């Protein structure tokens, strides 16, 4: 499993510049992905804590929704067409917000994002319901906007690879497993229990529903270190601290409580409402442009506006309905 992840990451790093590919790496064991620390492709330092993993998945869902809004604005269907369109316009890729976090501006090129989770079992034990819900949302919708998941586990039980996750992750790889039951859990059929080990695998994808037997490549640790050392010499990573800084409270196998604070007390909340009322539309990208704030802050203000009845709920690519006609209605309670 770990060798396969190293092979996959090295292949991606060889073929993609940091401006084209960003990585979020989750390593509960703290040692498997240590060689990749501080490479320029990382959006955040390698994550080892469950709380930060849930925060990163939550951020990825928000980023997915933001990207769909940008695709709708440009009237394109996927990230490839979007990037071709913005490159033809010659627009910049990103800027830094007031906190120094790198933000992709509206009209800027979108890098692909790959989230790699080295061991799913640890996460599912701590926050199964929320991890499952976030993974399913990303797996269902995020491919068109360039966000991809790589999930790995040494324990392929139904508690870890749930039916919902299986239904939304069509591409699967099985190495040697202990029993026929484990093979069925991964591939929906037996066979992986007969593999020989040392990279011998069965692969199943949406376009290849019948598993195909493949020999995996072997990447040695010193080869990984040479690649990552070279990348670190080229440039430093530009971390986005918002990815892992969202407050999260883990409640075992139950829910995760996201405490965003009272955005009604945000010093820009009233200014944001004024922008929405004047423009008669509401979106995070609009607040980013008009107020020059980061994406996460704009998204939280939009959520608070919806909770207070200032704007209507999201409706696909349609703009949100503005439900008040004046900022004064905030004070009057109308």
Language-model features: where?
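Conserved lysine of the Walker
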Residues: 1
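Hydrophobic positions on the alpha1 helix immediately C-terminal to the Walker A/P-loop
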Residues: 4
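P-loop NTPase motor-domain active sites and their immediate coupling elements
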Residues: 11, 19-21, 62-334
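P-loop NTPase switch/communication element
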Residues: 13-56, 164
């Amino acid at each position: 499993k770990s060798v396969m992840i190293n092979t996959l990451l090295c292949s991606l790093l060889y073929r993609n510049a940091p401006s084209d590919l960003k990585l979020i790496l989750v390593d509960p064991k703290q040692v498997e992905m240590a060689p990749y620390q501080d490479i320029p492709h990382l959006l955040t330092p390698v994550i080892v804590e469950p709380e930060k993993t849930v925060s990163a998945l939550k951020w990825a869902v928000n980023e997915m929704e933001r990207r769909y809004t940008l695709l709708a604005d440009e009237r394109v269907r996927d990230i490839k067409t979007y990037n071709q369109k913005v490159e033809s316009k010659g627009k910049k890729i990103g800027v830094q917000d007031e906190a120094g976090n790198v933000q992709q501006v509206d009209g800027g090129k979108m890098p692909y994002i790959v989230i790699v989770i080295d061991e799913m079992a640890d996460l599912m034990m701590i926050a199964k319901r929320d991890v499952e819900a976030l993974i399913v949302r990303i797996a269902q919708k995020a491919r068109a906007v360039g966000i991809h998941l790589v999930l790995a586990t040494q324990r392929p039980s139904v508690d870890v690879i749930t039916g919902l996750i299986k239904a939304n992750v069509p591409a699967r790889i099985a190495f040697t497993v202990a029993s026929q039951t484990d093979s069925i859990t991964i591939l929906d059929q037996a066979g992986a229990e007969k593999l020989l080990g040392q990279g011998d695998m069965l692969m199943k994808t949406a376009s290849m529903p019948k598993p195909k037997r493949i020999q995996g490549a072997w990447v040695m640790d010193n080869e990984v270190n040479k690649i990552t050392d070279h990348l670190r010499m080229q440039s430093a990573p530009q971390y986005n601290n918002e990815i892992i800084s969202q407050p999260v409270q883990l409640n075992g196998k139950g829910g995760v409580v996201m405490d965003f604070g009272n955005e009604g007390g945000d010093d820009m909340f009233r200014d944001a409402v004024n922008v929405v009322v004047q423009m008669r539309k509401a979106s995070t990208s609009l607040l980013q442009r008009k107020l020059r704030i980061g994406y996460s802050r704009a998204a939280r203000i939009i959520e608070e506006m919806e909770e207070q009845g200032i704007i209507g709920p999201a409706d696909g690519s349609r703009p949100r309905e503005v439900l008040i006609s004046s900022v004064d209605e905030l004070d009057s309670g109308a």
